[in-house]
């Protein structure tokens, strides 16, 4: 996968992963697709360019998305200042049913004539569009966080309608997002080295609700950034609570070392191995830890249930009574086992057994020249144990 594809497919704004469980009203609210920041920016730029050409910004604009689809967008706040050769247009982003941090953003384009620069189109980032400060994103450091696919799409849409405007003059297109600096605080942009605003993203132009492909790509991207910064360790966690726990346990590591892999174990480890990172940590609780013991590439509940035999066998190995072992074998959740064993004072030894099995499974599935350690916490994010690979192999 190319840098352009990988970065473009990263979760729209690489939003902090949030677990929305099956059955939740938020999860069940629908599958309506929406549009990426890149598609909305291209539509705004096309509308503003038409404004310069026609002396009036249209109320609706037809934009060609990166996937080739022709899509109508409603245009707001359109205006033209003919005396200064400037046109302005806004598209309000609709992310569909996806819980997108940038839903409702006012994607704004200002298009200005560049006298005597025939055929030239210059694309800039304005307020609310992040600035790239770190390598690893496939973008120029110091430039705007406008990814390659939407960058081309914006320029293509402008050129498609500019017509005679480009015969003698050029065009400067500035994309901005009012409030983008605040939206960015709800994303992982700062950790990736994108500061001051959101990213302009999207390889197809379409946002699909709860896209697992986007989440997986964001994991790969985060590892790329850590490696390009010269980090020698990466810490994979299964969510926000385990990440906070891992950060407390490893306070000397830079924030960029911490990657919420969610359910995407294979994507995380494959990326770390590709970059030859010498040290890998995993932070997890009992459920995901058990699924790592199972060797699952994706640990989501929809992919596979927790193997209760692993839980029961581990309980037996640490001395749990026979009746409890059978209860664990027929229980609905891994949490049941963890809590019952904790009540018997067996929490540490039980979780150590699981961590040892997880290390063996992970090293078998993802061989490479790296050292692995597993950090385990309880459901409140409190430390239970740490197991290094030399204790397991």
Curated annotation (Swiss-Prot):
It catalyses: Co-precorrin-5B + S-adenosyl-L-methionine = Co-precorrin-6A + S-adenosyl-L-homocysteine. GO terms for molecular function: cobalt-precorrin-5B C1-methyltransferase activity. One of its GO terms (biological process) is methylation. Coiled coil: none annotated. Keywords: Cobalamin biosynthesis, Methyltransferase, S-adenosyl-L-methionine, Transferase. Pathway: Cofactor biosynthesis; adenosylcobalamin biosynthesis; cob(II)yrinate a,c-diamide from sirohydrochlorin (anaerobic route): step 6/10. The keyword Iron does not apply. Residues 1-35 are annotated as: Disordered. Its EC number is 2.1.1.195. HAMAP family: CbiD (MF_00787). Belongs to the CbiD family. This is Cobalt-precorrin-5B C(1)-methyltransferase. It comes from Dechloromonas aromatica (strain RCB). The gene is cbiD.
């Amino acid at each position: 996968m190319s840098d352009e594809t990988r970065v473009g497919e990263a979760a729209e704004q690489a939003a902090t992963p949030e677990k929305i469980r099956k059955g939740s009203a938020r999860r069940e609210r629908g599958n309506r697709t929406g549009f990426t920041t890149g598609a909305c920016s291209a539509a705004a730029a096309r509308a503003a360019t038409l404004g310069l050409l026609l002396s009036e910004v249209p109320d609706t604009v037809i934009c060609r998305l990166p996937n080739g689809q022709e899509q109508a967008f409603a245009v707001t706040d359109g205006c033209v200042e003919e005396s200064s050769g400037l046109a302005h247009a806004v598209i309000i982003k609709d992310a569909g049913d996806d819980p997108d941090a940038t839903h409702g953003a006012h994607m704004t384009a200002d298009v200005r004539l560049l006298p005597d620069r025939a055929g030239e189109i210059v694309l800039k980032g304005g307020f609310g569009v992040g600035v790239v400060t770190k390598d690893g994103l496939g973008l120029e450091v110091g430039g705007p966080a406008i990814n390659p696919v939407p960058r081309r799409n914006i320029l293509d849409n402008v050129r498609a309608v500019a017509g005679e405007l480009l015969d003698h003059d050029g065009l400067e297109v500035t994309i901005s997002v009012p409030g983008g600096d605040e939206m960015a605080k709800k994303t992982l942009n700062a950790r990736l080295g994108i500061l001051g605003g959101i990213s302009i993203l999207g390889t197809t132009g379409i946002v699909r609700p709860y896209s697992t492909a986007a989440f997986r790509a964001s994991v790969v991207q985060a590892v790329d950034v850590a490696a390009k910064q010269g980090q020698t360790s990466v810490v994979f966690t299964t969510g926000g609570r385990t990440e906070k726990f891992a950060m407390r346990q490893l306070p000397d590591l830079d924030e960029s070392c911490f990657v919420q892999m969610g359910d995407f174990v294979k994507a995380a480890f494959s990326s770390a191995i590709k970059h030859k990172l010498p040290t890998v940590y995993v932070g997890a609780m009992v459920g995901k830890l058990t699924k790592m013991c199972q060797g699952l590439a994706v640990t989501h509940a929809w992919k596979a249930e927790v193997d209760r035999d692993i839980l029961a066998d581990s309980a037996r190995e640490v001395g749990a009574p026979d009746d409890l072992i059978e209860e664990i074998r027929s229980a609905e959740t891994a949490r049941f086992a963890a809590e019952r064993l904790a009540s018997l004072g067996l929490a540490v030894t039980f979780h150590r057994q699981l961590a040892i099995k997880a290390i063996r499974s992970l090293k078998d599935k993802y061989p490479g020249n790296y050292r692995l350690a597993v950090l385990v916490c309880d459901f409140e994010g409190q430390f239970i144990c740490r197991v290094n690979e030399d204790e397991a192999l």
